[in-house]
Amino acid sequence: MTLFPVLNNTPVGKQVDSIYESRLDQFLSEGQYRDFNLPSVYDHARIDNPSGDVNNDLSKGFVDLKVYRVPDLSRPSFNEVVGHKKFDETASKGDTFGPSWATFWFEVHIRLPKSWAKYEQVIFQWNCDNEGLVYSQDGVPLQAFSGSERTDFILPDSWKTTEDTFYIEMACNGMFGTGAGSQIAPPDPNRYFTLTKADLVAPNLPAMALAYDFLLMQQCVKQLPSNCWQKYKARQICNDIMNTFHPNDLSTINECRNLAKAFLGNDIDSEAVFEKNNDKANVFAIGHCHIDTAWLWPFAETRRKIVRSWATQMNIMDRYPEYQFVCSQALQYLWLKEDHPDVFEKLKEYVNQNKFIPIGGSWVEHDTNIPNGESLIRQFLLGQHFFEKEFGVRCRTFWLPDTFGYSSQIPQICRLCGMDRFLTQKLSWNNINSFPTSTFNWVALDGSQVICHMPPANTYTADTNVNDVLHSIDQHKNLVNDQAGLLVFGIGDGGGGPTPEMLEKLRRCKGIANTVGYLPNVKLGNTVDEFFDGILKRTNAGQTLPSWNGELYFEFHRGTYTTQAELKKLMRKVEIALHDAEYVSTLASIFSKDYSYPKESLQDLWRDTLLCQFHDVLPGSCIEMVYKDAIPIMSKVLKNTEALLWQAIEQLGFKKASSSDNKEQLCLLNTLPWNVRGVITETEENKLVYFESCDGKGILTAAHTSLKHPAAAYQKDDNFILVNDHLRVTIAPNGLILSLFDLHKEREILDLKSGKNHAGANQYVLFEDTPLSWQAWDTEVFSLEKYEVLDKGKVSIKESGPLRASVVVDIPISELSHMKATISLEGYNDCSEFTGVNFTCEVDWHESCKFLKVEFPVDIHSEFASYETQFGITKRPTHYNTSWDVAKFEVCHQKFADYSDFTYGVSVLNDCKYGFSTHGNLMRLSLLRSPKQPDAHADMGKHTIRYAVYPHSKPLDSSTVRAAHKFNSNFRLLTRASDTANLDIFDAFQLVGEPNVILSHIKMAEKGKSIILRVYESLGGKSRARLVIKSLTVASVTKCNGLEEDLEELCTLKSNDYYEVPIELRAFEIATFKVNL
């Protein structure tokens, strides 16, 4: 007998999809129907009037707040405040606290009603829309508050039956600073924060669990496609829950949760949900807390963000056994150790349990465009050594989710420093082209590779909603190669990290996948390294993955190559000074018995240098407060580095020259690893002296005031002429260069007939710079269409030779800004010397949203220009054939850019600039920007900029590489302190062979008394050379990795008074050698 009725007396209509879906919004809403829906029963009880209405007997005395106002903008510690300062003011909800960056300490005394002992959990709820940290009575950091994102502090069970006191440190800034009107606007110095919550709450935990159940099913309703049956099942269950729930009958909460099990399963209230179908997992979730070491807040605030974030994460780990968390940046761990050693020791326990996982291997999450190659290696040398020393961990994954482009040699440097995996996601921000793959092999200039994964959810701060899990697969760009995605979740940038709500949502996402399917199978409990291990296993050790060769160019934030020019210039100076100090200190430690290598002092200087290479600091995208810290830090580093250098110089028998010194004793220190044929410098009497050395020593001793090939300056008709035996420069009365003529090749170097610029070279152009967003970060392609040519200069002769000939061009920029450019040409003795046109610009800059550049139209045609990048050359197109080419309208470089054809080329050298473009016949160096957010005064003031044009009668070769090094070197004027000053010691380490092989750095080893020599091939060809070591007794020479660990012992050939070590490098290889004495 059938159960199907004969008669139909209960008609059922088809649900109207839009209405039934929209209805669901009511159930969790705090809006007009709150009293009829779930939010009405979130609390069993609440005491919400601390220190308030004395007539309110319920709240009286249960929560008492007293506050200590720190009188300035300092950030005193718990021990400096509690027990030493008076909490003599009462505080209440509705009170305001400020101004911006102020600190307040609260003493919170609570007394729970006896009737609350029955409740499973009691929380203290706090919200002042700023950041705070709870301390126990004995000063242990417990948990952070961060405005609406984190307001609940679960009271320990021991507090539920007693009175207790705890403390809250309040920082008067939001998670993202105190921007006036928008997040990235300059900070509002007078922002105040209102205390809106200081409540004791007994939460209804089943009701909260039902809220998560309903939320995740509602997300499925909204986000699953219309042809998916799970979408409609979720909607029906949600409607059934709304029909079942009654605010006056709490038993209906459990009934509703039972309804939800048909969609979510039975295991979502514990970690057991993740024990099913693990072999089918294709989304691997990992908690993360990205803390910018500085950005919209200063370094000092970051130190507090670290303890707030990490103490909170350890708290969450205790509640969710399946939870694992990664965090990078060795410096931040060091700061925690210095500021909160007790928390650091506790953190170590979680590291040992594989719950809190150090990752990244670097000192900070650094920029990779601006720092030089040695800096990139030092990031890992210091970072990996710290992680190994403190945790016994060597990181295998370079974790850099949020920086503004990725240098072409990063894979090689990673492999040299113990890492073969790389994670980022920033390229998802590209504003022109979509990067084609999510999982791939990234290949460096030399062929070294790392496996790279870009989380397909396109964020490192996922909220663990249904969409985040879906996008971890459906936005994966190459599922044909691998079908797994990493989901990196947690509040980030300003710290914070995952919340309990995120873990609850992940449990339910897993429950959905287990029960009804469709959602990707998410897994918690795998490390990032295990995730990469899985990829390698599934792809035949990566061999079936696509590859990407060379730089990962970021099609956004191109203005960061130029913004905050003073810090960038200091960074260049410091990197070179550290090179010099380590080199001379190494010599002094070997050859002077009374000298010890200043290892700790140099390491401290490197730490500060690497700090300021953080990916918002050095690129120029921080608030002004950060640069008021960073510029003095770098200035102090430069001063102290120079002091160490001079101490080492004095140990070697030399001293700084003075006007009273015997001129016969004057000499120059050359820290370059090759002979320098000529350097013109000024003595204390402002006299020019030409130094040269022909014997390969590191000291230039032959001084001249007359030359075989002098330079001259004169006026011819209305034009001005600079000339030596190699070049003739013709300058118009307005300062533009009309002709740059190679006298040896009888060739005009400039092209003023084609292209945009027909007026002349060294043409300064002021572009309107109004990007679509992110002022300090961005410059856009359309800015190239709106500009003003600065052609109203006035020229006068400054020097007429013979050592140097020069003119000065006085150029108005606007009513507010002005510049003075000196164009000079030097004489020389030997035809092999560098001969180029030098430019020194002194700019008084007071513009708004303008971009100053200088242009050189040259008679060269090639499809590609070459740019020096770290340890190599990166070629970029000079045309706009494709959108990928258009995107590179502004690119980053180091010391030079070169435009060459088969027979001739022009290099533009610089001493502190990083932005460049070469298109058509126009080479353009970026000089200064003037964004107004987030630093309203970025780059305002005086700047000195040096650059040079270096023509060469052949394609790009080692002469340009060496000229750029020479242009950036600081040749210090010395005098011999005694007759015992030994010149031979500067000849102790030489590299002999093909000139494209560069000895880039000499230092003492981190451990022991060995000497480290860093060598790289600079132009892109397999090459041979010989390390020559003189005046020393060598036990052995080994090739080692970037962490200075031996790889292989090399053949060492001994002659009468020196040792030779033959070496062979592949194209663009970076090699490190250890000389064991």
Swiss-Prot record:
Its cofactor is Zn(2+). Belongs to the glycosyl hydrolase 38 family. It comes from the Eukaryota. Its main location: cytoplasm. Keywords: Cytoplasm, Glycosidase, Hydrolase, Metal-binding, Vacuole, Zinc. It comes from Schizosaccharomyces pombe (strain 972 / ATCC 24843) (Fission yeast). Its EC number is 3.2.1.24. GO terms for cellular component: cytosol; fungal-type vacuole lumen; fungal-type vacuole membrane. The keyword Cell membrane does not apply. GO terms for molecular function: alpha-mannosidase activity; carbohydrate binding; mannosyl-oligosaccharide 1,3-alpha-mannosidase activity; mannosyl-oligosaccharide 1,6-alpha-mannosidase activity; metal ion binding. It catalyses: Hydrolysis of terminal, non-reducing alpha-D-mannose residues in alpha-D-mannosides. Pfam families: Alpha-mann_mid, Ams1-like_1st, Glyco_hydro38C2, Glyco_hydro_38C, Glyco_hydro_38N. It is found in: Cytoplasm; Vacuole. GO terms for biological process: mannose metabolic process; oligosaccharide catabolic process. This is Alpha-mannosidase.
